[in-house]
Swiss-Prot record:
The gene is gh. This is Somatotropin. Its main location: secreted. It is found in: Secreted. Disulfide bonds join C75-C179, C196-C204. CDD domains: somatotropin_like.
Length: 206
């Protein structure tokens, strides 16, 4: 009889162990996705702040007008099949949205590895790596093979230049910051679309 009384406790212990990995509880899909959205939002806001600060301090009205109408304003991500807005994103599967997001994040890892004056945020690179890892975990959780072979972004961006006395370097940094802001906005949008689709009850805003 003592063995029978012990059995429910043993069963509960075994069930709990199945929900852990290396002694730590595995986060729920909702938590993983919420963390990814928070990191994407942080990077998007950071990129927007740095872009506006840089524009105010280094870019004249004439330069601003000329660069927005030049090939320098082109972002690599515009050559990918990634959705261009939330309505387009809603037509994609969750796995596609994760893969698009991961490709955009990875395109910026090298440029942000060595940060110069134009960006000036030492935690940006770490946040980018955290988000990359978070997206990879989400993809493993949802892996179904449906998105294999999807053509994604193949380029990475140039590194930021620390030379603020060269007009060429200044315009290059301005263009890079503009692209970084656009790409982080895309990543945040994709992840919010995915979160709202899977967990509509969880403070869902896009």
């Amino acid at each position: 009889m003592a063995g029978l009384h012990f059995f429910p406790a043993l069963l509960a212990l075994l069930m709990a162990s199945l929900q852990t990995h290396q002694g730590f509880p595995m986060p729920s899909l909702s938590s993983l996705l919420s963390n990814a959205v928070q990191r994407a939002n942080y990077l998007h806001n950071l990129a927007g702040d740095r872009y506006r600060d840089f524009e105010q301090n280094y870019i004249s009205d004439e330069q601003r007008h000329s660069i927005k109408n030049s090939p320098a304003a082109y972002c690599y991500s515009e050559s990918s099949p990634a959705p261009t807005g939330k309505e387009d994103a809603r037509q994609k599967s969750d796995m596609d949205l994760l893969r698009f997001s991961l490709s955009l994040i990875q395109a910026w890892i090298s440029p942000l590895q060595i940060l110069g004056r134009p960006f000036g945020s030492p935690d940006a690179y770490d946040k980018l790596l955290d988000l990359e890892k978070g997206l990879q975990v989400l993809m493993r959780e949802l892996e179904d093979g449906s998105s294999r072979g999807l053509s994604l972004l193949k380029h990475t961006y140039d590194k930021f230049s620390a030379n603020q006395f060269s007009e060429e370097a200044t315009l290059k940094n301005y263009s890079l910051l503009a692209c970084f802001k656009k790409d982080m906005h895309k990543v945040e949008t994709y992840l919010r679309v995915m979160k709202c689709r899977r967990f509509p009850e969880s403070n869902c805003t896009i």
